Amino acid sequence: MKRYKLFVLLFIPLISSCFDDKGNYDYHEVAEITIEGLPELLEVVGGAEHIVAAPTVKSSLEGIITEDNPNFTFTYKMELKSGGTIVNGAYWGVTLNKNGRKDVDTLAPFAANTYLCMFIVTDIRTGRETAKLFDIKVTSPTYEGWMVLCNEGAQNRVRLDMISVLSKERTLPAYDLLASLGLPEVTNARMLGWAPSRFANPGDVIYLISEKGSYLLDQETFKTDESWNIKAVDFIIPPADEEPVYYISLNSGSSYGGEANFCVTDKGNAYCQALGTAGAAFEYPINTSERGLAPEFKVAPYVGVSMARPGNGNTALFYDTDNRRFVGWSTGTTDNPKQILSPLQDPEEALFSFKTGMELIYMESTRFSNGLVYAILQDQNGQRHIYGINMGGNGFVQESKYENLQAPGFDQASRFAFHSQFPFLFYAEGNKVHMYNLATNTTYESVITLPSTSEVTFLKFNLYQQPLLTLLNDQSEEFMARQFELMVGSYDKNSTDNNGGTLGFYKIDGINNKVSKRTEYSGFARIADVVYRERR
């Protein structure tokens, strides 16, 4: 008991000293931060729509916290909801609002997936953080629509944009889709290879072709990587020191898929992938007279085939640039095992000689006259001529020749497109597009005139390529007419953000020789090719 009294006596001075120190400390209430106005789930189309959020932040002591309040910072962090990381080795490695603003409005350049987003409010006076989570579901824009292949910036970085068809009533441009889908850094885009097939293997084939590498894209997601390089996927022996720059499929009538695929490399070698058997692949160069021998001549980066549907062609047209002559490929026989090219023999009463002695400027496959291929050739005097060779059936039928064209600027033009319903050639000159009537030798100048700061970079008619057009999921008259609209790609030379590209769609009135714009989309880089990703 004595010891207990002593303890109490010793404790009383301590209590007294605490009361004496009252007021020597800064006592304050800790603010409670609440976050309101964020959705539980935000749904966007990847590469096309923006992630938009404008939360309300409240302090129990200060009221509404605005984004200009110097005592607080705001951060949006994003990660895969299912696990793993967006950025390898960096958990929560993606910041949406790099400008630090409370409200976010930024493009969603992410692959299709469900993501977890964390909005963090930090009181920099105390270091205390308050966070709220919400989901972001990114859907794919790649299901159907116009794939727009572009070259971006001074380095011509390859990028794939798209005009996504989400429904009959809704289309939406999407940009730089492959940035998050594994495409290696490549430059100088050339074209998109598109070979639809109903066979389970390989199914629809989509190739991105560039001068620095060509890659197969996943037919649903567009994902790719170095292992999907065309040399690794479709060549028996990957060619060294050469890159495919042209790719096309030949359909000979099957309702399931093509007869053969062809590619031409930057070294002037041609290859054939004869389809119909498992494991079909590109073999040795076919620009030779005997299978497996070394190439005997170089070919131009064009292949002419019939684009009629149902398919009706058994042959393909090439141009020998060394000997300045047309050469041909045909379906296999004992003498021609699908892996050689043969010089074409002039027919009796020929319109022209297949050995032209001229430079091939351009060649295009069409549906006109049930499979006509047009070739633009230039003679030693710089004058240009147009030859028409029908590739339906066994092909190589000389059908038309056009000389002494009354077409101002044609001999200097580098962008061309031939119509498949009317005998019309379209060619570009600066910011203008002219229409030449092959039948009447008449030019309708400046049927399209773009702003003076724009330059035409691309002309094309996108013919649907399903083995049977009746397989297409949209059989409307309007949709079918789209393939006969002229696509005009242009670039604003004053653009400073690498997004000065515009794609316009123009209806052609072949009766009245008129052209009218239906619609256009902008925000692309410099357009190199456009192909419609069809659906059955």
Question: Residues of each region from the PLM?
Answer:
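Intrinsically disordered, low-complexity segments enriched in Gly and acidic/Ser/Thr residues
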Residues: N381-N499
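Short coil/turn segments that connect the beta-strands within blades of beta-propeller domains
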Residues: Y143-G145, G203-D204, G258-A260, N314, ...
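Repeat-based blade/solenoid architectures
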Residues: P184-A189, P347-E359, A407-A413, P451-L471, ...
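Acidic/polar, low-complexity intrinsically disordered N-terminal segments immediately downstream
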Residues: F19-D176, E477-Q483, Y491, S495-R536
